[in-house]
């Protein structure tokens, strides 16, 4: 049985069956973010292991990682680094290609967004297959960052994303898991 906190978080997350395709249970975290108490508690729970530790910046993955990452950066008095899809940033960038189910995509960040040795927390709303999070972590590591942790509200453990980050030596923190998805 799950704790009251985890059960309340799960209740705050809308499940949309058969979206974006049949057989998929889409976990919509925007309902949690729209609930002030649930959102604040989620941010607090993601932050508390790192409060008092040196965290230079929080890197958020487009798009919901921006919302969550900005709140976490604020609480940790850290800077914020957006990791975006190719072509969305206006200055000199570094990018990485990664595989999708049906092709290849790229993500990027500003070349001067982090300095070698900076301690970074990587953030997104959910980890599923881990392809996007793995690419973001590799990009940060290539830039010389030390990734303190990767934080997500939701883990879909059956899809194996967490293992990809752990294989890179990145600790993973999640708040709730939806198994069987």
From Swiss-Prot:
Pathway: Purine metabolism; AMP biosynthesis via salvage pathway; AMP from adenine: step 1/1. It catalyses: AMP + diphosphate = 5-phospho-alpha-D-ribose 1-diphosphate + adenine. HAMAP family: Aden_phosphoribosyltr. Keywords: Cytoplasm, Glycosyltransferase, Purine salvage, Transferase. The gene is apt. Homodimer. One of its GO terms (molecular function) is AMP binding. It is found in: Cytoplasm. Its EC number is 2.4.2.7. Belongs to the purine/pyrimidine phosphoribosyltransferase family. This is Adenine phosphoribosyltransferase. Its main location: cytoplasm. GO terms for biological process: adenine salvage; AMP salvage; purine ribonucleoside salvage. It comes from Brucella anthropi (strain ATCC 49188 / DSM 6882 / CCUG 24695 / JCM 21032 / LMG 3331 / NBRC 15819 / NCTC 12168 / Alc 37) (Ochrobactrum anthropi). InterPro entries: Ade_phspho_trans, PRibTrfase_dom, PRTase-like, UPRTase/APRTase.
């Amino acid at each position: 049985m799950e704790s009251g906190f985890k059960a309340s978080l799960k209740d705050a997350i809308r499940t949309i069956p058969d979206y974006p395709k049949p057989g998929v249970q889409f976990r919509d975290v925007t309902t949690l973010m729209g609930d002030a108490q649930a959102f604040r508690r989620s941010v607090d729970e993601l932050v508390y292991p790192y409060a008092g530790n040196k965290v230079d910046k929080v890197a958020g993955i487009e798009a919901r990682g921006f919302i969550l990452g900005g709140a976490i950066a604020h609480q940790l008095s850290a800077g914020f680094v957006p990791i975006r899809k190719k072509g969305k940033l206006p200055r000199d960038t570094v990018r990485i290609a990664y595989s999708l189910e049906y092709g290849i995509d790229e993500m990027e960040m500003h070349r001067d967004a982090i300095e070698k040795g900076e301690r970074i927390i990587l953030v997104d709303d959910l980890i599923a297959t881990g392809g996007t999070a793995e690419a973001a972590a590799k990009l940060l590591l290539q830039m010389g960052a030390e990734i303190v942790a990767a934080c997500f509200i939701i883990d879909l453990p059956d899809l194996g994303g967490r293992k990809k980050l752990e294989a890179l030596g990145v600790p993973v923190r999640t708040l709730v898991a939806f198994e069987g998805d």
